[in-house]
Amino acid sequence: MATAVAGPEIERLIQLLSRLPGLGPRSARRAALHLIKKREALMAPLASALQVAIERIQVCKTCGNIDTQNPCTVCTDPRRDPAIIVVVADVADLWALERAHASNGRYHVLGATLSPLDGVGPQDLTIDALVARAHDPQVSEIVLALNATVDGQTTAHYITDLLMEANVKVTRLAHGVPVGGELDYLDEGTLSAAMRQRTLF
């Protein structure tokens, strides 16, 4: 039987770190040791930042983004085009689009995608709020920026059906050859999507 080599407080730190995505027990142990070694330079500021996050970070009541203000900085930015709402599954997708400067519109975070196998149904997502936003006269386009997975496509079709009565154009991200990609390395599904969505050159 293995014996604990650290005190209960350190074991608790390791246990909590191991709950983070991408950190298994071994990586969590290394991260904990690094934090302890850099106590003043890293652990104290990290603890302070986490406390601020607990106290100040909120979910935007309009789009579902997370921010220290509500509505969030994206929703209140006057330079954003209010006619376009980009629908994403989660906040990480919103941040990815923002890093790429891919959209000047506003966003709507669903919270997940429909997944019957995981027990995620329409009632678990913010689809009703999206439909309500789509009926705003200012809104003219809904961009479905969802993953090219079965769950993502199912969610896109479900939302499209619900938006039939709204006076908006529903578009989705193109799927196909990535920038810098070589055809020989792409899977059949990606190549088929690229051929279907080809554009004039």
Curated annotation (Swiss-Prot):
Keyword field: DNA damage, DNA recombination, DNA repair, Metal-binding, Zinc, Zinc-finger
Protein's name according to its UniProt entry: Recombination protein RecR
Pfam families to which the protein is assigned, alphabetical: RecR_C (PF21175), RecR_HhH (PF21176), RecR_ZnF (PF02132), Toprim_4 (PF13662)
Zinc finger (C4-type) boundaries: 60-75
GO process terms (BP): DNA recombination; DNA repair
Protein family membership: Belongs to the RecR family.
Domain of life: Bacteria
InterPro entries named among the record's database cross-references: DNA_Rcmb_RecR, Rcmb_RecR, Rcmb_RecR_Znf, TOPRIM_dom, TOPRIM_RecR
Keyword Isomerase: no
CDD domains linked: TOPRIM_recR
Organism: Rhodopseudomonas palustris (strain BisA53)
Function: May play a role in DNA repair. It seems to be involved in an RecBC-independent recombinational process of DNA repair. It may act with RecF and RecO.
One GO MF term attached to the UniProt entry: zinc ion binding
Domain Toprim span(s) in chain numbering: 83-178
